[in-house]
């Protein structure tokens, strides 16, 4: 028997969300369906009973998958089957993971798998905004330990009005697009892009989102109570020795605090911290360490964390010796590589990005074929994080989720600065060569520099900064950190990235690890971030006051032209013959498409002459021949009665033997005209029925003195008469124009 339980959430605008459990996937630890309109997601959670031996972290795995059948489509590819996760699916996984992960108990180390699947969609409501709610609700109806519930919503500002979970159409018109994850009481995660908005406007969007989330969390608690899952399973994943914990603290804390306040570099500081714990472990035998090593590592990590936090809260001293508002030293180099179309190095402290820009044509557009999004992207940003950037000795595998997420943040920070009518496809590639925190923000800064070096006329330069937080007593005592290090991110309470121009914010990403973060702290963090952003922007402008006024010599050139829709077929030709010929003859690349009832042609090449040649050929094709005009032409074939001349691309006319010269020729061979020869011709007439062109060469030549116009051919007169009175003229022999009638 089914025991179906459901709750409905009213969004207050005529729409509602239904959460249901007890019908599908009943063997999972928890399973719910979330329905909004015709959009249906299934979320399931399963957890191992015991932790893996030696595991000291939260092994959470979140998967999000969209079925093409949800919208009635076939997948692409040879197999016609869903394959590896798309970038969009990976980004949705990360949004859910970042909101859930901090709320599992610190000492819970069993593997947890969260799967969210889109089974139905209508192309109107956005399913990624429901994935966090679905995942949390599945945990709520399970017995897996979880300090939730949470929910996630998207908030967009459209025409000055904040909308919760907007439609695809509404989002296209929004100047604020925020995804917010939160519990009933606290913001946990924020990510979004904006069109140069003020800090207060972004905060208002977060407030609107949190109010909607509170309603959704309440519905989950009611659902959990209805299915009797308020009591969670018992577990014991850590072995503790309180005497050992105290011993580690007593013997290591003072030395760790000294290292935390020494102001040394990343590797020197790491070695100093490592030396302390190694000397502590030296007092134990190998047999004792086999039992205690894992606990010692865990307790010493807590000592390091406490030392760093106390140094900041009590003395205002950071690990590298900076003040809380201080930005690391910055050095910049642009035009550093001869091959790319644009390049820049941005180094901030021990974080360095080498970023390049490649300019391409329409054929370089990226085709996006997601379930609910079929489009082409003209601005790409790729972020690479090789192991050597942190000094790690391990192989470099494929692109990971972290790289996709960091690249997406930098992409959103810069994309609104690319002019909408920019003719080039732009690819920005950031290779992180050194990393000690804020590498995604270094990518934004280096991306701005490289784009300007490439001659891309971006609307405004963009800079970015990562902020941190150290707090205690529910946020009553706190310190906000500008331009955080990797250790400050790891040991702190917040990672808050903000990008923007001098006029406002373009993108943000925030992850909070503690309860009780007030809006006052967020306001202060945003204000401090603004000061940091503007400082970094000043350094960028010092190094590169202006955008390069032209592209580099080896960058492709692009010209656009518009033609009537009716000429598109003529330019392409049968089987693409004409357009391929244009490309072969000119050396340029030609792309054509119909836009708003017009043919839009993009001509690109490595130099201006090849582009001009292609443009000339296209103009010739679309040009309308005018009677009386003179055209340069080329003889394409020679016939007994005259020559065919191509006087415009794709347009041929007959040059009759009688129109070659004022002189009379008996045969076409007497004219000495050859196939392939170039001559000038004048268009005499266009047949109104057949559209055939009648050409003349002789009218362009000077008429000989004493020239007498030939008399009308007798043959034609007699032939007309013959049609009335019979065929009585001689067909054989004699001059063609003076044939004698038969006896």
Swiss-Prot record:
Reactions this protein catalyses: RNA(n+1) + phosphate = RNA(n) + a ribonucleoside 5'-diphosphate
Major location category of this protein: cytoplasm
Gene Ontology CC terms, in alphabetical order: cytosol
E.C. code: 2.7.7.8
UniProt-annotated stretches for the region Disordered: 704-743
One function term, GO molecular function aspect: magnesium ion binding
Domain KH residue range list: 556-618
Keyword RNA-binding in annotation: yes
Span of domain S1 motif: 628-698
Entry binding sites for Mg(2+): 489, 495
Keywords from the UniProt entry: Cytoplasm, Magnesium, Metal-binding, Nucleotidyltransferase, RNA-binding, Transferase
Entry's localization field: Cytoplasm
SMART domains (UniProt xref): KH, S1
Required co-factors: Mg(2+)
Entry annotated with the keyword RNA-binding: yes
GO annotation, biological process: mRNA catabolic process; RNA processing
Function: Involved in mRNA degradation. Catalyzes the phosphorolysis of single-stranded polyribonucleotides processively in the 3'- to 5'-direction.
Family: Belongs to the polyribonucleotide nucleotidyltransferase family.
Protein name per Swiss-Prot or TrEMBL: Polyribonucleotide nucleotidyltransferase
Species per Swiss-Prot/TrEMBL record: Porphyromonas gingivalis (strain ATCC BAA-308 / W83)
Recorded name of the encoding gene: pnp
């Amino acid at each position: 028997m089914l025991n179906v339980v459901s709750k409905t959430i009213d969004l207050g605008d005529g729409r509602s969300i239904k959460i249901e459990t007890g019908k599908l996937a009943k063997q999972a630890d928890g399973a719910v369906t979330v329905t909004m309109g015709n959009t249906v997601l299934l979320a399931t959670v399963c957890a191992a009973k015991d932790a893996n031996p030696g595991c000291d972290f939260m092994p959470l795995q979140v998967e999000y998958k969209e079925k093409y059948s949800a919208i009635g489509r076939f997948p692409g590819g040879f197999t016609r089957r869903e394959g590896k996760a798309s970038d969009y699916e990976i980004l949705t996984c990360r949004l859910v993971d970042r909101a859930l992960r901090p709320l599992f108990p610190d000492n819970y180390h069993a593997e947890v798998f969260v799967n969210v699947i889109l089974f139905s969609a209508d192309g109107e409501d956005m399913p990624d905004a429901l994935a966090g709610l679905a995942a949390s609700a599945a945990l709520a109806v399970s017995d897996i330990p979880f300090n939730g519930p949470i929910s996630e919503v998207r908030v967009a500002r459209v025409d000055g009005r904040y909308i919760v979970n907007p439609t695809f159409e509404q989002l296209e018109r929004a100047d604020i697009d925020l995804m917010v994850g939160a519990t009933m009481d606290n913001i946990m995660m924020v990510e979004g892009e904006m069109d140069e908005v003020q800090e207060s406007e972004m905060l208002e969007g977060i407030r609107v989102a949190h109010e909607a989330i509170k309603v959704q969390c309440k519905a989950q608690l009611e659902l959990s109570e209805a299915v009797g899952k308020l009591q969670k399973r018992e577990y014991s994943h850590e072995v503790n020795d309180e005497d050992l914990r105290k011993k580690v603290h007593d013997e290591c804390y003072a030395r760790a605090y000294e290292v935390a306040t020494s102001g040394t570099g990343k590797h020197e500081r790491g070695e100093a911290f490592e030396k302390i714990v190694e000397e502590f472990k030296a007092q134990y035998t190998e047999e004792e360490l086999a039992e205690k090593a894992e606990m010692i590592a865990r307790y010493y990590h807590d000592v390091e964390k406490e030392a760093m936090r106390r140094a900041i809260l009590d003395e205002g001293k950071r690990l590298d010796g900076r003040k809380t508002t201080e930005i690391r030293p910055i050095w910049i180099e642009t035009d550093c590589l001869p091959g790319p179309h644009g390049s820049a190095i941005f180094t901030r402290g021990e974080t360095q990005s080498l970023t390049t820009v490649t300019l391409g044509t329409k054929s370089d557009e990226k085709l996006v074929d997601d379930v609910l999004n079929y489009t082409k992207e003209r601005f790409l940003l790729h972020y690479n994080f090789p192991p050597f950037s942190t000094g790690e000795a391990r192989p470099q595998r494929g692109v990971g989720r972290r790289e996709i997420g960091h690249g997406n943040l930098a992409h959103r920070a810069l994309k609104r600065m690319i002019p909408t009518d920019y003719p080039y496809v732009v690819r920005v590639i950031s290779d992180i060569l050194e990393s000690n925190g804020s590498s995604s923000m270094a990518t934004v800064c280096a991306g701005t520099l490289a784009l300007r070096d490439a001659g891309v006329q971006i609307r405004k330069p963009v800079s970015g900064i990562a902020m941190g937080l150290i707090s205690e007593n529910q946020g009553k005592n706190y310190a906000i950190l500008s331009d955080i290090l990797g250790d400050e991110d790891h040991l702190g309470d917040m990672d808050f990235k903000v990008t923007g121009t001098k006029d406002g914010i373009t993108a943000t990403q925030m992850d909070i690890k503690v309860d009780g973060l007030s809006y006052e702290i967020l306001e202060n963090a945003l204000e401090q971030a603004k000061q940091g952003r503007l400082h970094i922007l000043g350094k960028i402008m010092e190094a590169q006051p202006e955008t390069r006024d032209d592209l580099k010599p080896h960058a492709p050139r692009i010209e656009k032209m518009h033609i009537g829709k009716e000429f598109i077929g003529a330019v392409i030709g049968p089987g693409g013959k004409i357009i391929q010929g244009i490309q072969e003859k000119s050396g340029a690349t030609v792309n054509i498409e119909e836009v708003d009832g017009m043919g839009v042609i993009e001509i690109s090449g490595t130099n201006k002459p090849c582009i001009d040649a292609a443009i000339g050929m296209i103009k010739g094709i679309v040009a309308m021949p005018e009677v009386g005009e003179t055209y340069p032409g080329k003889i394409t074939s020679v016939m007994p009665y005259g020559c065919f001349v191509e006087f415009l691309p794709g347009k041929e006319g007959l040059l009759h033997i009688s129109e070659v010269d004022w002189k009379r020729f008996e045969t076409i061979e007497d004219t000495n005209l050859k196939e392939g020869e170039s001559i000038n011709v004048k268009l005499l007439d266009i047949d109104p029925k057949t559209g055939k062109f009648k050409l003349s060469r002789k009218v362009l030549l000077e008429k000989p003195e004493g020239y007498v116009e030939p008399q009308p051919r007798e043959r034609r007169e007699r032939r007309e008469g013959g049609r009335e009175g019979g065929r009585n003229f001689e067909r054989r022999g004699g001059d063609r124009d003076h044939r004698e009638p038969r006896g």
